[in-house]
Structures are given as C-alpha cells and as structure tokens.
Amino acid sequence: NNCHEKLPHVKIGPAPNISAVYPKSNNPADVQAADLYTAIRNWLYLDIAVYGVYNHQVWAYLEENEALPDMEPGDLEILKSAECDFIAFNYYNSSTVQAYPAGTERATGKKDQQLSDSQEGFFAGSDNEHLPYTEFGWQIDPTGFRTTINQIYSRYRKPLIVTENGLGGIDKLEDGKVHDNYRIDYLRNHIEQMNLAVTDGADVFGYCTWSAIDLISTHQGFRKRYGFVYVNREDFDLKDLKRYRKDSFYWYKGVIASNGGKLEG
C-alpha cells in the first residue's frame, strides 16, 4: 500500500522461489505430504502477497509446531488491504517429498536441497528416479517449470515474470574457453516449456536467467557457477579475476536477438 500511495504509477509484486512439488508415490500419505509441503514451500508467501491471508494449512502447521507469528491488532487488516500487480518468481528445480512419520528413519533424500526439505512427522525430501540431477544434487525438471507457471497463474491470475532461472555447475576453463553445453541444454529446455505454458494460456511477460556472470553461491561458493561469463578465481585464490565468455554467452545472445525465436545453437 505504501509503495502504491507514494508511487501510484509503479507496479509492485513479490519475488519468492517457487517450484512444483511431487509426491514420491501415489500412496495417500505421500500425496498429503506433498500437498502440505507445497502450501509451505509456495502458497504461504503468495497467498499473503495476493490475497492478504495466511494459507490455512500452513497456519495449522505453524500452530501445531508452536511457531505462529506475533500479530498486532490491525495486522490482518493491513495484509488484506494490500494488493500486488504481478508475481515475480524464481525457478531452478522441482521438489519430491514423501511422508515422514514421527519416530521413523528417513529412507531416501540425502542430496543438497532435500536435506532442508524435511520436517519429522510431516514430510521429507526424496529422490526422483524419473529426473536427472546436477552434480550438486538438484533435480533438472523443465516440465516442472511449465507446471509451476500454470499452477501459479491458475491460482492467482496475475501476470508473471521469471526473475531467476539457471543451472549451477562446475565449469572448466580450457584455453580461454568454457564449453558449457549442459547450461545451454538446461536453459533451452526451460524456455521451451515456458513457451508451452504461454500456449496453455499463462500470462508471462518476462524471463530472466541467473546469472550474467559467475558469483558466489551461498551453498558452494565459487565451485558452483551460474554465469554466462566465467570469472577466473576460486574460493581462496583470486587469481587474475579475468573474465571469459562461455559458449552459453554466445548462445543466449542469439536468443535475445531473436526474442526467443532462436533456441538452437
């Protein structure tokens, strides 16, 4: 509200990280676990931003775990009166979860992201045998990108912009070049699925990759690189910090020049 009042001609929207969530199996317990995790992972933030209410499943979950937020008189009314103009979101990978009964040992899901996708008594991150993984244990799921776009648009009917989408990998500099076809394949497949979501009827007005240049990853430092431009340094060795354009740089330059029409390279 404050932004709209001070800048009435400016549009504003949230930018959370959102992903499709799959149940490990068709076991109703796994389906229920995936449903709860979806509410926590995705709808908690967006329900507040768009509808001005806490998701009912998440509220019950927080209450059961004695983690309800402190609310002052009038807070709910302020939330309810707020309005966003669009939804920005980041997508890197989908998630797969299974039921995690209290007092039991986790059966699967030991990879990077899955370890944080876990709450005993509710859900646990799990492997997905139908999807490939990056060397850092992230699911590669372009189809899940289309699913995520359609889920968000169907639920909220707000224009969408993708603010981050990319692949973090260990790039190798060889004779001043970086041949990162894996990144090109990842981005091409995701853009194709985004185009299909638009064909489905979703209103997507923008797409941004992550990232233009290598930067420090919060999980793996400079070992995990996302950029189109290689920075010649390591975690504890700055080297010469020289920049090198990767193969993906030239590929994406063509994608931009063709407004997404040229995806083959």
Regions found by a protein language model. Give the residues of each.
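Active-site region of glycoside hydrolase catalytic domains
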Residues: 1-265
